[in-house]
């Protein structure tokens, strides 16, 4: 008898290529493809946001929220297959009132929107004839669904054997709403207590997921440890310590087809680990594009949201010392006006050393990776970080603070397996010292060339991460179904 493939429904608020607000969408578009290429029967569920085409009609049904009936229409799309793999079906949960909008997040009725999505998701499984072994949820928007699965739907025979996994991509974002959201969703009022969903007088959707998920993971091993501390736990560290035996860390991968300097359509000159001449030409093109002198001065790239989390304040107070060095800095990003203003001032004071683009532009970001010698990630905290993994792929050496996924993926060049420059203390002078160590390394040309070739050959594909997720799924299934 042929063994049935593992069935996984991957649930996310955003998924590339359909809708994206942040890195979650990249994960949700890439990990299912890698799972499918490993033989998993994986499907994706998400809302049909306003910018998403209608897709093929599958079915519709009524969903009860707030003691009234709302219609959910299911439409289907697909994520293209990896080479040698299978394409991934995507189920769009369509309700114009809640999701026919321009943005994914940031509305006053977000509690109702994600509450409706949660119940509509669980009601969808039988109409589409797909009862998964694993419901893989992502971030706070899925919290109500996890609670509903455990508190209500577990009594339904078809749902009894489903195991739930919650991936926390960034614990800072939790989803806080008034107590009345429980009635809207249809969750019991007695769950409004400190050991369940109550959090400082509000309902916390992330906490709902952390309390009721069978297993939890974050997007790096170090971040899984960090969120159990008061410094990084955002008020949920006590709960996470209680659940430490159910908490795991799996580092994200990157889409090595998209991020490939040998084929990337956004960079002017292609190159590889075997021949990096194209990278030198890309650097000159980048310098010209940003109005910088074309020179061999080391070029530092920074492509981030300009917010506290990314460590941008570490530039404050080291500007004069930094730009006395023989270097150039190219910045692409937007965010806090304080940090946008900081880089505008630096551009004004050091016009031959600083290139700046306020905003986000994917082709331009790719050119920064393709032309930079170093890539800066001095993050205050970083659950995983994709920037350093992309930088490796393009031969830009990361200069990072040792936190979260940066600690898991970047090892200082002082060690035999080193692949970047790492500093520990969150202090401007430590950041400056790390940059200076990088500049010293850059001047050792033979060692520098060897390091570039080495980091470009590192394997940070999703296939490796997918193998770890399959092990996690097995553990979750055995927890719910001990007979397996």
Curated annotation (Swiss-Prot):
InterPro entries: Glyco_trans_1, GS/SS, Starch_synth_cat_dom. Gene3D superfamilies: Glycogen Phosphorylase B. It catalyses: [(1->4)-alpha-D-glucosyl](n) + ADP-alpha-D-glucose = [(1->4)-alpha-D-glucosyl](n+1) + ADP + H(+). One of its GO terms (molecular function) is alpha-1,4-glucan glucosyltransferase (UDP-glucose donor) activity. ADP-alpha-D-glucose binds at residue 20. PANTHER family: ALPHA AMYLASE DOMAIN-CONTAINING PROTEIN, GRANULE-BOUND STARCH SYNTHASE 1, CHLOROPLASTIC/AMYLOPLASTIC. This is Glycogen synthase. It comes from Heliobacterium modesticaldum (strain ATCC 51547 / Ice1).
């Amino acid at each position: 008898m042929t063994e049935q493939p593992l069935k996984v429904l991957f649930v996310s608020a955003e998924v590339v290529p359909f809708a994206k607000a942040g890195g979650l969408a990249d994960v949700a578009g890439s990990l299912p493809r890698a799972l499918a290429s490993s033989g998993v029967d994986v499907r994706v569920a998400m809302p049909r946001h306003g910018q998403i085409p209608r897709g093929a009609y599958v079915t519709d049904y009524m969903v009860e929220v707030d003691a009234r009936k709302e219609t959910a229409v299911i439409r289907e799309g697909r994520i293209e297959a990896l080479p040698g793999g299978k394409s991934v079906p995507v189920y769009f949960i369509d309700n114009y009132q809640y999701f026919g909008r321009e943005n994914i997040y940031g509305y006053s009725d977000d509690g109702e929107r994600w509450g409706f999505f949660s119940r509509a998701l669980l009601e969808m499984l039988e109409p589409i004839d797909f009862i998964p072994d694993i419901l893989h949820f992502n971030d706070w928007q899925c919290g109500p669904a996890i609670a509903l699965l455990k508190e209500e739907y577990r009594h339904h025979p078809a749902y009894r054997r489903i195991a739930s996994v919650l991936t926390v991509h960034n614990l800072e974002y939790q989803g806080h709403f008034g107590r009345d959201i429980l009635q809207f969703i249809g969750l019991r009022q007695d769950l409004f207590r400190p050991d369940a969903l109550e959090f400082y007088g509000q309902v916390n959707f992330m906490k709902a997921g952390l309390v009721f998920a069978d297993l939890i993971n974050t997007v790096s091993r170090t971040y899984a440890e960090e969120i159990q501390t008061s410094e990084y736990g955002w008020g949920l560290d006590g709960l996470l310590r209680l659940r430490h035996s159910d908490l795991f860390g799996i580092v994200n991968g990157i889409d090595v087809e998209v991020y490939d300097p040998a084929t990337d359509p956004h960079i002017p000159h292609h190159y590889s680990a075997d021949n990096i001449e194209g990278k030198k030409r890309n650097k000159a093109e980048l310098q010209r594009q940003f109005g910088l002198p074309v020179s061999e001065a080391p070029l530092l790239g920074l492509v981030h949201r300009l917010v506290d989390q990314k460590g941008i304040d570490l530039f404050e107070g080291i500007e004069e010392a930094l730009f006395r060095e023989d270097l150039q800095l190219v910045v692409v990003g937007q965010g806090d006006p304080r940090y946008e203003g900081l880089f505008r001032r630096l551009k004004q004071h050091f016009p031959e050393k600083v290139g700046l683009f306020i905003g986000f532009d994917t082709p331009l970001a790719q050119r920064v990776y393709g032309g930079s010698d170093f890539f800066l990630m001095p993050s205050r905290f970083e659950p995983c970080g994709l920037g350093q993994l992309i930088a490796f792929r393009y031969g830009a050496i990361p200069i990072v603070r040792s936190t979260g996924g940066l600690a898991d993926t970047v090892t200082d060049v002082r060690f035999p397996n080193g692949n970047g420059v790492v500093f520990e203390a969150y202090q401007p002078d430590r950041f400056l010292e790390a940059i200076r160590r990088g500049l010293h390394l850059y001047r050792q040309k033979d060692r520098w060339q060897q390091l570039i070739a080495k980091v470009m050959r590192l394997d940070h594909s999703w296939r490796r991460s997918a193998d770890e997720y399959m092990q996690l799924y097995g553990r979750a299934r055995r927890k719910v179904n001990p007979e397996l």
